[in-house]
Amino acid sequence: KDMLLFPGFAKSFHVVATPRGALRVAPVTMADVLVIQNKGGGHGEIGFHLAQQLVSRGDAVTILHEGDGPNPKEAHRAYGELPSDVKVIWGGDLSEAAACLAKLEGASFSSVVDNWSKSPEAIAPYATAAKAWGVSNYAYVSSAGMYTPNKGDYGAVGEECAVKSSGQRQAEEKIAEMGLPFSYFRPQYIYGPAQGKSYLAFFFDRITRGRPVPVPNGGDQLVTMTHAADNAAMIAAAVGNEAAVGEAFNCATPSLVTYDDLVRLCAGAAGMECEIAHYDPAGFDKPDG
């Protein structure tokens, strides 16, 4: 991995949705949706936007949230903006699935969006509950980090690309083996105004302090940056949508920028000039700490 930026930053491929994986928008029925939401990281803002979008079209939304309550992170502070009829249940340790499911007090749901599980062991009890409820769709948000393009390959990576057997890939396989009507969503780099983990904060920090921004190699590698609300819109389109069942979707914008251009966009947003310093990641020794 290349250092100083964010994991995988200097990889020379990006994900795009292929025609085979394009989400066909079909009429959807109103749903009772359970969103299983993690407490932060790159996925931390998705649940907020997803709840807003689902409620706006008439769905009922319950968020089973990791953690004991709101913390100072941006995504949690934004929850005050959610409609009052969005029910947020703080589940504590979601790996204690029996206790967390008991907090639902016997409620059942027609669709589940799992934005928390990262292993087959984690997803299994929630998938078992979903199967008992007879859900029309179990939308699982995994990661585009599972793709393993051939060494030397450049350009777009579609859903048919080979994947490694990561915990998230095994979770995908688990819900398929269980016979659930699944949809997989594989986001890459996510940003947004309430992001708990900002991939862009490093750039803004360097730019606003007048420091050079280190960019690996020549800076002409392409990357996708997708707004959390757009990720949520793709996922929301699958809820209650039979056309989405059994499909994997790259959850990323088709708009591509180079790493150098991404730094310049950040500088423009900050109203400042920027200096880019290219470096060879292969010859860089990461300091300890």
Q: Predicted segment positions?
A:
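A conserved pocket-lining segment of Rossmann-fold NAD(P)-dependent short-chain dehydrogenase/reductase
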Residues: 206-226, 238
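Conserved Rossmann-fold NAD(P)-dependent oxidoreductase catalytic core, especially the SDR/UDP-sugar
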Residues: 124-178, 183-184
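Short-chain dehydrogenase/reductase
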Residues: 44, 153-173, 197-201, 224-225, ...
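N-terminal Rossmann/SDR dinucleotide-binding element
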Residues: 28-111, 180
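Mid/C-terminal beta-alpha module of Rossmann-like enzyme folds, strongest
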Residues: 232, 237-289
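Flexible, glycine-rich beta-alpha linker
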Residues: 185-204, 221
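N-terminal Rossmann-like NAD(P) cofactor-binding module of classical short-chain dehydrogenase/reductase
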Residues: 109-115, 139
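N-terminal chloroplast transit peptides
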Residues: 1-23
